[in-house]
Amino acid sequence: MDMEWNPGFTIRVTVDHGAVLLSANRAGLRSLSAQLAALAEETPGAHIHYDEHNALEEGSTELIVEIRP
């Protein structure tokens, strides 16, 4: 799956009191929406890893999104 990012994207994922907060600017949300739409076309078990080394802001919590059957 091709991971494309809109210019200037920022995305942060944090966990606070058991709640996951995903916050992003417009470019980040557009990037995520395109990637999630592409993931929806994959086979069950396909997944995307997001972390501070490939997409998220420094200090973010790793996020894995997976498609289920």
Where do the language-model regions lie?
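Positively charged, low-complexity terminal tracts
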Residues: 1-69
